Amino acid sequence: MTTQNQLLARAAARNNAEWCAAMSRSHGLVSAFEAQAWAAPARTPPFYPDAVTLVPEAAVAALVHRIDITSAGASVKDSFADLDLTDANFQVLFEAQWIHRPARAPAIAPDLSWNVADDPDTVRAWALAWDNGNGNPDLFRPELLDEPATFVLAGRSACGRVVAGAVANRSDQVVGISNIFALDGGPDAAWPGVLDAMCRMFPTLPVVGYEHGDDLAVAVRHGFEPVGPLRIWLHGWCSDRMDTSGV
């Protein structure tokens, strides 16, 4: 990894940790930032890590000590893919890439109307569309409206129904995107609207996130560049704790 890419990866990791902290707060959970990692001492919401490293070569023992590993399901986002947590009974769930896109308009114009959810009913409609019947719509709570750096982006059809979306989280240097979806066409259909919204809302900030597999290829087609690897480690095996949706 080049020095520039490492700086970009660190900015993306910090932004992602700030989003994980916001999601935890929306569920009434306390967490804390320290020099090497963000961590929550109690189990975080489903699909969200209990810790995110902020620098390369974080101290493993101190990191594991900050989270609850008394039961299966604890997870760590190893932001630089440089830790070995096997001795603490963790296994790699999946690997991914941090992605970065300079601040600029999308190459493809959006075909939906996009806005920021600003009331509980819209957050609920967004959550139901994001979940698409998989049983986790309560993950996204109206308390997210109290987070000044978090923006739930809703793409609406001509009849006003939420059919696409993403979450944007602003930090000092970047704006992070996660949970991108479209009921028809998947992330490929959602990215133009999301990037157009970011260009309007934060015209000077680059966009970051992380993806893997087919979703990484889609992000690259929309102007992103991979800037560094990461790993998700899972304590024991508990398939409903984490998925690969890019949180």
Residue ranges and their predicted role:
Residues 52-58, 180-187:
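A short, internal acetyl-CoA/4′-phosphopantetheine-binding micro-motif in the GNAT/acyltransferase core
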Residues 185-197:
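Conserved acetyl-CoA pyrophosphate-binding loop and the N-cap/start of the following alpha-helix
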Residues 54-120, 195-199, 204-217, 221-239:
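Acyl-donor-binding surface of acyltransferase catalytic domains
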Residues 119-129, 245:
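A short, well-structured alpha-helix characteristic of acyl/acetyltransferase catalytic modules
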Residues 135-183, 228:
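A conserved beta-strand-loop-helix scaffold within acyl/acetyltransferase catalytic domains
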Residues 29-31, 89-90, 150, 224:
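Short glycine-aromatic motifs
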Residues 1-70, 130-149, 246-247:
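N-terminal charged segments
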Residues 1-28, 38-43, 102-107, 169-171, ...:
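Terminal substrate-recognition subdomain of acyl/acetyltransferases
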